[in-house]
Amino acid sequence: DKLDGQEVLFPVALPGSLWEESGRYESVGSELLRFTDRTGSKMVLGMTHEEASVQLVREYANSYAKYPFMIYQIQTKFRDEARPRAGLIRVREFTMKDAYSFHTSQEDLEQYYQRCYDAYNRIFARCGIPEVAVVKSDSGMMGGSISHEYMLLTAAGEDSIAICPECGYSANVEAAPSIVKNENTIAKEELKEVATPGTGTIEELCEFLHIPAENTAKAVVYQRNADDSYVVAFIRGDLDINETKLTNALGC
């Protein structure tokens, strides 16, 4: 409220037409719970409420004089998590405070973002929770140029973060830039076809050919949600593809 926010309460069940308009009805995966009402109209259980907030604003905030402003709610959210586990760590139904601000310029948005950032820092400090790391993160399906996560450091967690004790930089590994050392000293040879029967993994291939994993490459095939097209990504055999960075690079 000190940020001049106005509290609202959006419906849990939302018209699928709003999500179709934004494109997220198709682009969001199975985490979005979809169903139809008795008339056959598409409905969803809200995992976030961007579409609902935009619908509200475009109906009632039809004058520049009403901007900027922020609306927020504390509401039940639903996500059909593939691996719900560990109590509050990953659940299908949870309570979340979400806020949506509207501005007439990018500069005003960035200034307000900093106010929200400072407010969350004060909240955690007031609650006396010391083991909270503020890290840069990927904006995911929400998009945007910058995003932060407040992560509680615990052995029970499932995310990994990178923190530099020298400069204070911190980021989720999904968003942190990295440099791969090119230490491949393999001698160049003529291209030739080699039979590798019964080698379904990089480990089996390396054992069969008696070579290290960094001297191999693997291809991983993905299917886009939006248009069902395929993407083939190649990476060195001893590394794993960062799917978040791949998604951002492809713009999908």
What are these regions (language model features)?
Residues 1-81, 214, 222-225:
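Active-site loop/lid in soluble adenylation, ligation, and acyl-transfer enzymes
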Residues 1-38, 100-140:
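TRNA-binding/sensing appendages of the translation machinery
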Residues 39-43, 75-78, 102-107, 120, ...:
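Short C-terminal domain-edge/linker segments immediately following a structured domain
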Residues 50-55, 59, 85-99, 107-252:
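Extended, low-hydrophobicity, polar/charged segments
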